[in-house]
Amino acid sequence: MSRVGKKPVIIPDGVTVTFDGNLCTVKGPKGELSRELHPDIKITVEGNEITFERPSDHKEHRALHGTMRALVNNMVEGVTKGFERALELNGVGYRASKSGNKLVLNVGYSHPVEITPEEGLEIEVPSNTKVVVKGINKERVGALASNIRAVRLPEPYKGKGIRYEGEYVRRKEGKTGK
């Protein structure tokens, strides 16, 4: 039995969850999210709890059980608290700034790199070496943060590049000269 799938999702006050066939819609104070869920997993709403049941112990159903519960839980958490992902810029002259809605990165290329967030996502630049991505959809927040990090991945010799806050980059020893 999936330990994640067994736990019910608690619906906080101010959040409404509706199921229309396979479509799950979650409305809350920060916005609205909807997603298609797998038809095999049985979902029941009792009071302020959502429970998930799988039809059999097949490998596919066991995998889907916890996944569907986690997806709905992330939607509920997103419309109440929201998600954020912080990134740090390490390197001489590496700077981040905002120009209107766009993020402008100066990370050692001959040109500044501009990144435009998609609808529903917000980029903040609290300092010129820190970038914070915020939104209600956990997947999209993580994807945008990953795209920003991919502009200049952290390198193992000097540690220069864009990394997630708190990420450990394994360092390598340089070549020894004669």
From Swiss-Prot:
Name the Gene3D superfamilies on file.
Answer: Ribosomal protein L6, alpha-beta domain (3.90.930.12)
Keyword DNA repair (UniProt): no
Described function:
This protein binds to the 23S rRNA, and is important in its secondary structure. It is located near the subunit interface in the base of the L7/L12 stalk, and near the tRNA binding site of the peptidyltransferase center.
Query: What name does the UniProt record give this protein?
Result: Large ribosomal subunit protein uL6
One GO cellular component this record assigns the protein to is: cytosolic large ribosomal subunit
Recorded source organism is Shouchella clausii (strain KSM-K16)
Q: How does it assemble?
A: Part of the 50S ribosomal subunit.
Pfam families attached here?
A: Ribosomal_L6 (PF00347)
- Its family? Belongs to the universal ribosomal protein uL6 family.
Q: Which InterPro entries match?
A: Ribosomal_uL6-like, Ribosomal_uL6-like_a/b-dom_sf, Ribosomal_uL6_a/b-dom, Ribosomal_uL6_bac-type, Ribosomal_uL6_CS
Top-rank lineage group of the source organism: Bacteria
Q: Which HAMAP family match?
A: Ribosomal_uL6_B (MF_01365_B)
Please give the Gene Ontology molecular function terms for this protein: rRNA binding; structural constituent of ribosome
Keyword RNA-binding found: yes
**What are the GO BP annotations of this UniProt entry?**
cytoplasmic translation
Keywords, A to Z, come to:
Ribonucleoprotein, Ribosomal protein, RNA-binding, rRNA-binding
